[in-house]
Amino acid sequence: MSVGDETTIFDFGNQMPKDIHDTLEIVYNALEEKGYNPINQIVGYLMSGDPAYIPRLNDARNLIKRHERDEIIEELVRVYLKK
């Protein structure tokens, strides 16, 4: 196998999902309070990594930057699929 053919495995151990959940709740509420579409803004942040999608209101920007974007996506998929 060549170097690019191997599957990389991510293991986040026992990352506290509640912590990510709480962060997303705060971010969602801050976005709503500012009058933005929270889903579009969060997706924009997760896709681009640009923190400008998230407001500073209620420290939402700093809170979401505490988590790696791939950890947030993993938790969203896990909760969506109930796994």
From Swiss-Prot:
Pfam families per the UniProt record, alphabetical: IreB
Organism: Leuconostoc citreum (strain KM20)
Superkingdom in the source lineage: Bacteria
Similarity comment text for this entry: Belongs to the UPF0297 family.
Protein name in UniProt: UPF0297 protein LCK_00468
